[in-house]
Swiss-Prot record:
It is an enzyme of class 2 (transferase). One of its GO terms (cellular component) is cytosol. This is Ribosomal RNA small subunit methyltransferase G. It comes from Hydrogenovibrio crunogenus (strain DSM 25203 / XCL-2). Specifically methylates the N7 position of guanine in position 527 of 16S rRNA. Pfam families: GidB (PF02527). The keyword Nucleotide-binding does not apply. The gene is rsmG.
Amino acid sequence: MTENEKHLYVARLDAAAEGFGLPKNDQAWSKLLDYLALLQKWNKTYNLTAIRDVDEMFIKHILDSLSVAPYIDSERLIDVGTGGGLPGIPLAILFPERQVDLLDSNSKKTRFLVQAKAELGLKNVEVVHHRVEAYHPETLYDGVVSRAFASLDDMLNWTHHLLKPQGHWWAMKAQKTQDEVAQLPNFAKMSQVFELHVPSLDAERTLIKIEKCQET
């Protein structure tokens, strides 16, 4: 990525942040672009994403991940089925004071995540190579986020053991899922649905917030 291209992407991040209601953050933008470069560099080796075009990666991965940042307020968060680190790494870059753990069962992807954590200097990130249903952390999380990881019902059932009571699931979905929301398990209750607007992306995006309402 040339210096001129970096300046253009920084300008787009500034504009996107204004639209999302986030402050401009030059240090975070620099790390996000470094992360984008790592995604592009290692994608062929690690098969991190089907997207090959760097501008499409910027829109569908970086901006899409940032679009949820104004809503997710969990201080200790786990990103399940994180793949190449989405949305976890962008959130960890934006909120260095929060703990963001990245879980995936694919060893190639977790190797990339370990490398990305080191190169980006993300001290608030831990990489977990595990199947989600078999992972039992010593300390429970107050937030679980996923990005098109599974059906909403599967997400809740596979991850409820990771979450504190009164903690929240944050499910990023490509479209409204009324049927899924109407059939929540008894340990979960609907909180809010946020409609997301990602610059340069002509597609529906929603963030579903669900509260864990009892011990299971």
